[in-house]
Curated annotation (Swiss-Prot):
It catalyses: (2E)-geraniol + NAD(+) = (2E)-geranial + NADH + H(+); (2E,6E)-farnesol + NAD(+) = (2E,6E)-farnesal + NADH + H(+). Catalyzes the NAD(+)-dependent oxidation of geraniol to geranial, playing an important role in the biosynthesis of neral, an alarm pheromone. Cannot use NADP(+). Also acts as a farnesol dehydrogenase by catalyzing the oxidation of (2E,6E)-farnesol to (2E,6E)-farnesal, with lower activity compared to geraniol dehydrogenase activity. It comes from the Eukaryota. One of its GO terms (biological process) is formaldehyde catabolic process. One of its GO terms (molecular function) is S-(hydroxymethyl)glutathione dehydrogenase [NAD(P)+] activity. It comes from Carpoglyphus lactis (Dried fruit mite). The lineage of its organism: Eukaryota, Metazoa, Ecdysozoa, Arthropoda, Chelicerata. SUPFAM superfamilies: GroES-like, NAD(P)-binding Rossmann-fold domains. Belongs to the zinc-containing alcohol dehydrogenase family. Optimum pH is 9.0. PANTHER family: ALCOHOL DEHYDROGENASE (PTHR43880), ALCOHOL DEHYDROGENASE CLASS-3 (PTHR43880:SF12). Its cofactor is Zn(2+). Monomer. This is Geraniol dehydrogenase.
Amino acid sequence: VQNPGASAIQCRAAVLRKEGQPMKIEQVLIQAPGPNQVRVKMVSSGLCATDAHLVWGEQKISDLGGIGCPAIAGHEGAGIVESVGENVTEFVPGDSVLTSFQPQCGQCESCLRPSTNICKKYDLIKSTTDVSTARTLDGQPITSLFGLGVYSEYITTTEHHVFKVNKAANLEHASIISCSVGTGFYSATNLAAVYEGSTCAVWGLGGIGINTLFGCKYNKAKHIIGIDVNEDKREIAAEFGCTEFINPKTLGQPVEQYLMDKFGGVDFAFDCVGYKPILDQAAVSLAIDGTMVIIGAAAKEVKFEMPAFNFLFNRKVVGGLLGSKKTKVAYQELCDMYVDGTYDVDRLVSNKFSLDQINEAFQTLKDGNCIRSIVVFK
């Protein structure tokens, strides 16, 4: 089913006019879907630190290329297909979909290889600077971050940036599956391949870290240590599999020393923050044959130190997007787990905001007063 007669839609979006300044709710034009594109009516969008670094001005959008601001941020979304362009065969209006920063064309060498989810057809940076689908009312191009820009009532994107999911899933909460849930869970179960009886440590218990804990639990790790300076994370960490909570501020000794003394190091060290001191700490907390997993979105200039000698004892460092899981499979699996009650996604949504409250929503992320905050569209 195609919609050749579809036209541009005027709707509201949170437009970032300059990094570091509050977003403004503006009327924008979302273009009709062209060939191999779909237009989606958004139901909800999650708030992720990757977008926050740009919104807060810690990184300039123009550094990624393209025009920079004005821009519409957001990549973690759920919605209903409103219309489709020519050549689209997988989607019809009414389909429930999740949006993804990790597109899959399904045909390139990488998409056909089971070991990676990095599609060669789509460059992440170029996707981030897309200006083809959103306009101001006077015709000025707007950057749609990650080729999506889901802080908008409607989006137009490629058919490879959206993925059909179980219609029984509550889309108001399912948006967080597309990034924080999927990234954390599959970083443990797929990328790291946590094994039964292992010892795992997770630094940073935000939206991704909590789901990493659950992935470790799902794969039957024995010791699952959650590390965070926010004591308020202790309760929910335990609910999602944490067997021991460490607050570095009150521990009384360096975390790496404690982990070495008590466990002989950890089999898996997950960095869910992306800051150098934590990366350094995780790197020297590994047991023999241990694996360090980099999940946090570190700035390009961030480097960490690990003695080269340590690698002689089969220690290794890995990283990936969405836990290196194929996006289509990941979203369908997780939505099915959500629907059947295996995965308590609802518990992870700690704060809900309207689009008009989006700046307030980002403040909860900055203050650490949330597991995952979402914007719900009415």
